[in-house]
């Protein structure tokens, strides 16, 4: 059964957080514009806030924070911790869930601990060679979306992929 929740936000003050400090800032700003339009179409009182870090101000009597910040700060638990601290409801998962989902190493450890099947993996910290056979995927563990992801099909591609990943994080998954 399809449900219509559009009336829930009509007249509510919604702080739409977008931008952020990460590499996904342009995508977040585009997403923010689309979300602002959609929220206004259902009657929400939308306040668009372009932020680049933890120093931002919410409008007084904000009813809801709609987080559309992708990647670092918006999805890594940092923003959620701030919002939990001021007691404002927000979209998405809480601080702990955000931290676990954003850090792919922490996620993999939890999957393994819970017995959830997942692809073979290892952590590289530099100067190591991988024990995983090619083809493989190399990724900085704390980047959002597909930032820094490399699908390595040939052995000669591995060095450049790892170099790029290490330019983004001190570990590679």
PLM ranges: what are they?
Residues 124, 149-154:
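Short beta-strand-to-turn element immediately C-terminal to the catalytic PLP-Schiff-base lysine
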Residues 52, 69-72, 141, 155, ...:
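Anionic group-transfer/hydrolysis microenvironments
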Residues 109-118, 157, 164-167:
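Basic phosphate/pyrophosphate-binding loop/patch that engages nucleotide-derived ligands
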């Amino acid at each position: 059964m399809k449900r219509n929740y559009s009336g829930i936000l009509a007249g509510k003050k919604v702080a739409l957080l977008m931008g952020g400090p990460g590499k996904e800032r342009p995508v977040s700003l585009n997403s923010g514009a689309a979300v602002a339009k959609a929220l206004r179409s259902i009657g929400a009182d939308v306040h668009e806030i372009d932020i680049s870090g933890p120093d931002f101000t919410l409008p007084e009597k904000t009813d809801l924070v709609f987080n559309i910040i992708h990647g670092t700060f918006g999805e890594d638990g940092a923003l959620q911790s701030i919002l939990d601290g001021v007691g404002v409801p927000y979209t998405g998962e809480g601080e702990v869930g955000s931290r676990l989902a954003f850090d792919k190493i922490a996620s993999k450890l939890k999957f393994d601990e819970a017995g959830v099947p997942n692809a073979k993996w290892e952590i590289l910290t530099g100067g190591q060679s991988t024990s995983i056979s090619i083809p493989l995927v190399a990724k900085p563990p704390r980047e959002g979306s597909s930032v820094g992801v490399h699908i390595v099909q040939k052995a000669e591609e591995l060095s450049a992929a790892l170099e790029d990943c290490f330019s983004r994080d001190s570990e590679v998954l």
